[in-house]
A protein has these predicted regions:
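Conserved pre-motif I regulatory segment
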Residues: 1-25
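Conserved ATPase "switch" residues in P-loop NTPase domains
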Residues: 16, 44, 139
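Pre-Walker A (Motif I) flank of P-loop NTPase domains
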Residues: 18-24, 48, 87-88, 142-143
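The conserved Walker
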Residues: 28
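Motif I (Walker A/P-loop) of helicase-class P-loop NTPases
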Residues: 32-41, 127-132
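Conserved nucleic-acid-binding Ia/Ib motif block in the N-terminal RecA-like helicase ATPase lobe
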Residues: 44, 48-99, 159, 169
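SF2 helicase catalytic motif II
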Residues: 90, 95-96, 104-146
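Conserved interdomain linker/interface between the two RecA-like ATPase lobes of SF2 helicase motors
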Residues: 136, 143-145, 150-220
Length: 220
């Protein structure tokens, strides 16, 4: 299956091929994961491994399954699960990577690229320092691909990355290929997607749970 790439995807992939760090800010569903796939392909073809981090275990498990289904040699490190830890691509929680850096894990010698998905978590008051520590202390030879749907003050964040990691391209798109629709869906409180939303520190999600609590009171 073939499809036309969007301008921001072409720009990001071009920067990756030039061995730059890249910060991609684009709406959910716009194709950021495809950029990551092309980056993984580039580095693994050069016999360099890749670490792909997400902020929570459920999302790491999902990405592990996604990449495995693409026939990419993929391992998983979440604390709860360890699968194929010496694979070309390791999907891990952000804290796991931070611990690998501080312990001088031998596997870092084979890493050419770190993908930090949901990098806007850096502004989280409780966990944001984990992202900062990774960006500051990761070996200087490792390149970064930063992915986010929304980053406040993205230019300021970009300049900070440049000061620490060198040449970094900022790629930004406001185009939303999938229309945003607002609707109400009843979910079991143990639903995995609901857990992901609850774990977010984005204040906009407070509206969801304010409604959820009111709805539960109404049902009683």
């Amino acid at each position: 299956m073939t499809f036309n790439l969007d301008k921001f995807q072409i720009q990001a992939i071009d920067s990756i091929n030039k061995d730059f760090n890249v910060l991609v800010v684009a709406p959910t569903g716009s194709g950021k994961t495809y950029i990551a796939e092309k980056a993984i392909e580039k580095y693994t073809k050069q016999n360099q491994n890749v670490i792909y981090t997400t902020p929570i275990k459920a999302l790491s498990n999902q990405k592990y399954n996604d990449f495995t289904n693409l026939n990419i040699d993929t391992g998983l490190l979440t604390g709860d699960r360890t699968l194929k830890p010496d694979s070309e691509l390791i999907v891990a929680t952000t804290e796991i990577l931070r611990n690998m850096i501080y312990s001088n894990d031998e596997r870092l010698k084979q890493i050419g690229l770190i993908v930090l998905d949901e990098v806007h978590y850096l502004s989280d008051s409780e966990r944001g320092t984990t992202w900062e520590e990774i960006i500051i202390h990761a070996p200087k030879n490792i390149k970064f691909l930063f992915l986010s749907a929304t980053i406040r003050n993205k230019e300021e964040f970009h300049n900070w990355i440049v000061s620490l990691r060198g040449k970094t391209d900022l790629v930004h798109s406001n185009i939303r290929p999938v229309p945003l629709e607002i609707s109400l869906v009843g979910l079991n409180p143990h639903n995995e997607q609901l857990k992901i939303i609850k774990s977010s520190k984005d204040k906009r999600n407070n509206k969801i749970f304010k409604f959820e609590k009111q709805y539960r009171r109404y049902k009683r």
